Amino acid sequence: MIVVNKEDCIRCGACQGTCPTAAIEVTPEDVIYCDICGGEPKCVDACPTGALKIEDLVVDEAGNTQGRIVFNPDKCNECGDCVEVCPPQILKLDEGKVKKIPLQGFCVMCQKCVDICPVGVIGVEGIKEPAKVELEIEGPIFIADCVGCGMCVPECPVDAITLEKVGGVIEIDEDTCIKCGVCAQTCPWNAVYISGKKPEKRAKEIRKFELDEEACIGCNTCVEACPGDFIVPKSSNLTVELPAICTACGLCEQLCPVDAIDLDVELGPAKPASEEGLVWDEGKCDFIGACANICPNDAIRVVTREGMKLPDNEKVDEEPSFAMCTRCGACTMACPKGALSLVDMDKVIDGEVVKRKRVQYNPALCDQCGDCIEACPYDMLKLTDEKVPLKGFCILCDQCIPACPKGALSLK
């Protein structure tokens, strides 16, 4: 069966793009895949018509075998029993669609995911162990094996990152950096580590990834530049083949000498990265939104499981999410008038009085230029028509903590 080292996975999604049966799904939080239930697939047992069965497949020259799931669509009555019992919930019926194969999500042991993984974290049990990344992260800012794609540079809210040359190595100004972690969450190759942590990845959608074959001259610059070897040369017509899904770092597009590659990537919002003051525990959050509704300054935004964006009470077609002001200070550095500042306030934590940062706003100094809104890495700030024209910054009032029924918010 397929095994995945999720901890070191860079969430590029190349495995998902190459899987012929949609048996692997990659999200910023997890990698969900068919592991054939350890050799005893529940879907096979549940199928009342015998449309699903397991058989052994020889996978190497030594004659070692692995189980694979075989699906016969002629026997399938689309009852959905297999979908109901699937532990990782990867099996799906394409109901209402005219398809020769109505069921997706079962592993046929083709090993295409193993072959395409750019960091080798997908393996086959007993045959090939998934790679493990051994890193000694040193200091609050740590850069390892940067490919020089520059994807993080425009995302930095305080312009602390520079890249002298595409394909080189980024530099981060430690005096300017506010440790918000947006660069680490954005980096498609897990090359940046802030505050000693492995980053949670941002959601990412490849809206366009196209090759102009008439413009392409077959120089293979993109093939040689791609850190993941995703691009395949086509010598027969002097072009290349782009992957269905990859890290979308953009090196190929930037280095193409004839501008034959067009890549458009939409990044999802950054996740709150804070270890002091108000801290969010993603594992406990149930995306109810009580915290967002009670916050007096709209410094928390929640999309509930029912698709309501709070506190705006707006129905949206989005996955459940949580965002908040982390008091990172990006807005205070961007404000040209000094209307925003980070100030210390006393807080009692575990019986001890400690200093914690809050955002302080002086509306008399604000000219409503919007520079702070542009700088906010979490897209929290907004201008209003009220007496206090700016909202979205955390004043550390703590009202959200008791409002959360799951205990997902706390002071640290």
Curated annotation (Swiss-Prot):
Please verify whether the record's keywords include Glycoprotein: no
Free-text cofactor note? Binds 12 [4Fe-4S] clusters.
Q: Where is the 4Fe-4S ferredoxin-type domain positioned along the sequence? A: 1-29, 30-57, 67-96, 97-127, 138-166, 168-197, 207-236, 238-266, 276-305, 314-345, 357-386, 385-412
So which cofactors does this thing need?
Answer: [4Fe-4S] cluster
Q: State where [4Fe-4S] cluster binds.
A: 9, 12, 15, 19, 76, 79, 82, 86, 107, 110, 113, 117, 146, 149, 152, 156, 177, 180, 183, 187, 216, 219, 222, 226, 246, 249, 252, 256, 325, 328, 331, 335, 366, 369, 372, 376, 394, 397, 400, 404
Membrane spanning stretches: none
Q: Which domain of life is it from?
A: Archaea
Keyword list, A-Z: 4Fe-4S, Electron transport, Iron, Iron-sulfur, Metal-binding, Repeat, Transport
Q: Which PROSITE patterns match?
A: 4FE4S_FER_1 (PS00198), 4FE4S_FER_2 (PS51379)
UniProt GO MF annotations? 4 iron, 4 sulfur cluster binding; electron transfer activity; iron ion binding; oxidoreductase activity
Q: Which cysteines are joined by disulfide bonds?
A: none
Q: Name one Pfam family in it.
A: Fer4_3
Q: Which InterPro entries match?
A: 3Fe4S_ferredoxin, 4Fe4S_Fe-S-bd, 4Fe4S_Fe_S_CS, Fe-S_Ferredoxin
**This protein is called what?**
Polyferredoxin protein MvhB
Organism (species):
Methanothermobacter marburgensis (strain ATCC BAA-927 / DSM 2133 / JCM 14651 / NBRC 100331 / OCM 82 / Marburg) (Methanobacterium thermoautotrophicum)
